[in-house]
Curated annotation (Swiss-Prot):
Gene: pth
A Pfam family assignment: Pept_tRNA_hydro
UniProt site positions, description: Discriminates between blocked and unblocked aminoacyl-tRNA: 9
GO biological process, one term: protein quality control for misfolded or incompletely synthesized proteins
Name of the protein in its database record: Peptidyl-tRNA hydrolase
Length: 189
């Protein structure tokens, strides 16, 4: 069984923020694949399923998302290497897309929570959301909407990452990485 997790914060207040790009990708996957909702509360998140693939949007808020993922992992007996986490990354320029297995949390509180609850060897799909001018602005930056110019590219970016995630269901990580990685939004056709 494969588990895709999109990191984000619940509620309309956060819906279109940089931190919620993972939720947007999960929504795209669920729509594209016709996955059905199997739980809104039992796993501290919205959980969807089609065949042997699960899609999770934790509703615990970003900093506690590891709890939700751990619950789903244990209930469905999912191996760590079969978990794919989609998240924002301020260390990448807007529109960059990177894939990797394991690694540190890089200051991302959602990843910090995951690492504490399930370990580090899951696959990460990192989506660049740009970086604020000063480190002290990070919390405000990720909790705000994309710029008007960036908003115009979000749909294409989300579709690209969604397609990459679908490829991960049948292709190996290195092959997906070589085909779908982007240095910035300019690399998106």
């Amino acid at each position: 069984m494969t588990l895709f997790v999109g990191l984000g914060n619940p509620g309309s207040k956060y819906e279109d923020t940089r931190h919620n790009i993972g939720f947007k990708v999960i929504d795209s996957l669920v729509d594209d694949l016709g996955a059905r909702n199997i739980s809104k509360n039992a796993f501290q998140g919205e959980l969807y399923r089609i065949a042997n693939t699960l899609f999770l949007k934790p509703t615990t808020f970003m900093n506690l998302s590891g709890k939700s993922i751990e619950t789903v992992k244990q209930f469905f007996k999912i191996e760590l290497e079969d978990i794919i986490v989609i998240h924002d990354d301020i260390d990448l320029p807007f529109g960059a897309v990177r894939f990797k297995r394991g690694g540190g949390h890089g200051g991302h509180n959602g990843l910090r929570s995951l690492d504490a609850h399930i370990g580090k060897e899951y696959i990460r799909v990192r989506i660049g959301v740009g970086k604020p001018e000063h480190k002290s602005q990070v919390a405000d930056y990720v909790l705000h909407r994309f710029s008007e110019e960036e908003e115009k590219e979000i749909e294409r970016l989300v579709k690209h990452v969604s397609n990459a995630c679908k490829a991960l269901l049948c292709e190996d990580l290195n092959k997906v990485k070589s085909y779908y990685s982007l240095k910035s939004i300019e690399g998106l056709e």
